[in-house]
């Protein structure tokens, strides 16, 4: 097993790099609800993230740095982490799903981190899956993990990437209410409950996207703003023909709480 070796210096450097990287490629990272996370007290805390793209890893990292006042860790396939060991310095550790011993090590290591008060960010679907595929299905690892840690709170996190009114796509994130599991819950029951919870958040996120209902989202990270691509082209042609600069500006219709921006 490859254990995490968190480095504050590497975390700070990676945060700056990833923030710039996301700003160049996306219009915004938007969060719903636009407020602090629901209180869970000192309970062990897990974030269960939908997994439609490799971008989810970076989105989870950015949210962990901005929303959670805890040390954060995330498991990764052992073969992948062996190739990119530098990620261990960001709080990533390995899991070998192909062996009983590997799963046992994962459960032991993760349980220890949770009991230390850390937050765990996990993609329980286990593989990249389209946002809107139904039903949502998890691998069994999360259910087994939750069953071993009485009192753990699990927050479902739905993530989608959509082109709306801008040339670059939006990252849209919907946080669900924490689900708390006490001692005695069966792993299969836990898995089904959390599958339904994440599916509910994905459906709510889909409905907001279809309705273009962005007023309830907060801007966590803002990229370069512009008008829609069509108007950009039309005004650019007009400016070229007339020789006059285009004075138009485009306002952000989404709330932008300063506590989230970085």
Task: Give, region by region, the residue ranges found by the protein language model.
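Conserved beta-strand scaffold positions in the cores of enzyme catalytic domains, especially
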Residues: 31, 74, 92-94, 154, ...
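Helix-to-loop junction immediately C-terminal to a conserved catalytic motif
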Residues: 11-51
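Non-catalytic C-terminal accessory region of glycerolipid acyltransferases
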Residues: 2-6, 43, 104-262
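Short, glycine/polar-rich helix-capping loops at beta-to-alpha or helix-loop-helix junctions
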Residues: 15, 81-83, 166
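Short, well-ordered coil/turn elements that cap or connect secondary structure elements
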Residues: 23-26, 69, 87-89, 149
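Residues at the C-termini of beta-strands that transition into short coil/loop
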Residues: 35, 78, 96-98, 158, ...
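Short, flexible loop segments at the rims of nucleotide/cofactor-binding pockets, characterized by
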Residues: 21-28, 51, 96-101, 131-134
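Catalytic core of membrane glycerolipid acyltransferases/transacylases, capturing the structured
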Residues: 41-100
């Amino acid at each position: 097993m490859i254990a995490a070796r968190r480095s504050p210096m590497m975390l700070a450097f990676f945060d700056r790099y990833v923030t710039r990287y996301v700003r160049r490629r996306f219009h915004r990272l938007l969060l719903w609800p636009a407020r602090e996370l629901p209180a869970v007290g000192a309970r062990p805390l897990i974030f269960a993230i939908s997994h439609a793209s490799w971008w989810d890893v970076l989105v989870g990292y950015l949210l962990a740095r901005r929303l959670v006042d805890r040390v954060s860790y995330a498991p990764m396939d052992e073969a992948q982490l062996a190739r990119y060991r530098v990620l261990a310095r960001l709080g990533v550790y390995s899991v070998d799903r192909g062996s009983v011993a590997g799963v046992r090590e994962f459960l032991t290591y993760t349980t220890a981190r949770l009991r230390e008060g850390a937050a765990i960010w996990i993609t329980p679907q286990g593989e990249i899956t389209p946002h809107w595929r139904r039903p949502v299905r998890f691998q069994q690892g999360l259910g087994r993990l939750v069953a071993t840690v009485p009192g753990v709170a699990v927050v479902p996190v739905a993530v989608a990437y959509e082109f709306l009114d801008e040339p670059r796509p939006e990252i849209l994130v919907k946080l669900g209410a924490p689900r708390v599991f006490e001692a005695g819950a069966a792993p299969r029951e836990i898995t089904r409950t959390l599958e339904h919870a994440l599916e509910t958040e994905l459906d709510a996120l889909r409905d907001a996207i279809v309705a273009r209902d962005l007023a309830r989202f907060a801007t966590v990270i803002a990229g370069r703003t512009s008008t829609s691509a069509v108007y950009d082209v039309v005004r650019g042609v007009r400016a070229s023909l007339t020789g006059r600069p285009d004075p138009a500006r485009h306002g952000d219709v989404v709330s932008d709480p300063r506590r989230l921006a970085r």
